[in-house]
Amino acid sequence: MDERALSRAWTDDVADDAREAALQRLVAAAHARWPAAWLAPTTFVAELALRRSDGEREAAALRRMTDHAAELYLAVACQHGVDAAVRAFDAEYLGEVPRLLRRLPEGEGLADDAAQAVRERLLVGDAQRGPRIAEYAGHGGLAGWVRVTVVRGRAQPPAGTHGGARARRRRARARGRG
């Protein structure tokens, strides 16, 4: 995104100097939390502009994003394939996914395979849709967003994978008992 497009994306109800100061604070807070997951500030700011809700005033968006600056930064860095960000996301947010999946009615036997499918859906995407992490907009914490994404997805594996080798073996055993 060029500088003019970036400027237009953020121009509505905040003075230029206030906007610049707010964006600098966002970038500084994010870099402080995830120093190894380096992302160009212009890339981060451009992605923040894309995460404004339809009709959301700039001042409100900046306040919301300030509350979740570090989480937004991590999500954007993951979306852009920054290895340190992906490792941090795995450690900080995906560790609880298998436990969460085991609590779902259909998740007890499929937790490990489903957790890998969730990771792929969040960080890689598929042919029809890019990585879901790109949809995180800072309306609440990233951990909560991950939990909601897991539960709404009901831990279904991506199309065409059928849950991996373990799931295929379980289905084969179930058919044999049928």
Task: Label the predicted regions.
Residues 1-178:
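Intrinsic, short, N-terminal disordered tails of RNA polymerase sigma-factor systems
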